[in-house]
Amino acid sequence: MRQLEICCYGVECAVTAERAGADRIELCSAPAEGGLTPSAGALDSARRRVSIPVHPIVRPRGGDFCYSPSEFELMKSDISFIREQGFPGLVIGLLDVDGHVDQRRMRQVMQLSQGMDVTFHRAFDLCHNPLLTMAQIADLGVTRILTSGQQQSAESGLPLIRELIRQSNGPMIMAGAGVRLSNLQKFIDAGVMELHSSASQRVSSTMRYRKAGVSMCSETEVDEFSRTCVDADVVAAMKNVLMAASPGRVA
């Protein structure tokens, strides 16, 4: 059966996504950074309030996926905490300076997360050789790979995604980045069995007073009086499309 994972930047969004029919949650913070590790409070709340599988992302900062020794120590601490909290899986990815999987560190990750589902996130889309990387990830025992097919959007990356599905002898290939209700059928037709989407909308702040000329972000064009939230209607519609589709085959 096809699975719909919703990327959520807060616990309220995760609750909304579950009620709308999501199969799994990727829990993050910091949407402007592409997703960072959620706070301890968010993790605790998610464990208490969400019944479907929640996989927190382990990513200490934005930018690339080649981490310093101190950053990796922080990541290991986060993995241990996430496991202690009882989460069934996590989302992570590490590359070396040459764009290959950091296999030494990923082996440590797999040891620390033993018994959990591990998703190798879109660090995969920045790797040097995707087919070799997939084989290395399979050898590590990673459960799935989240990928846009090394393109800005998964729709543009469908040729590589199809090839990865054909050649994968282990990890599930999950398409993500620009996966929407409007293009969902293309992924179904390509035989993709797991889809990752934010299914989001911008929601205006409830604040009446809005101080002009002052921003908490160096990117001054960012609207700080709105935020990204899950759209329940979109999640429900996407799930209905997936449930109505026949079992996939690679086109």
From Swiss-Prot:
GO molecular function terms listed in the Swiss-Prot or TrEMBL record: copper ion binding
According to its UniProt record, where is this protein located? Cytoplasm
Pfam families in the record:
CutC (PF03932)
Alphabetic keyword roster: Cytoplasm
Q: GO cellular component terms?
A: cytoplasm
Q: Which HAMAP family match?
A: CutC (MF_00795)
Family per UniProt? Belongs to the CutC family.
Name assigned to this protein: PF03932 family protein CutC
Per the UniProt entry, what species is this protein from, by scientific name?
Answer: Erwinia tasmaniensis (strain DSM 17950 / CFBP 7177 / CIP 109463 / NCPPB 4357 / Et1/99)
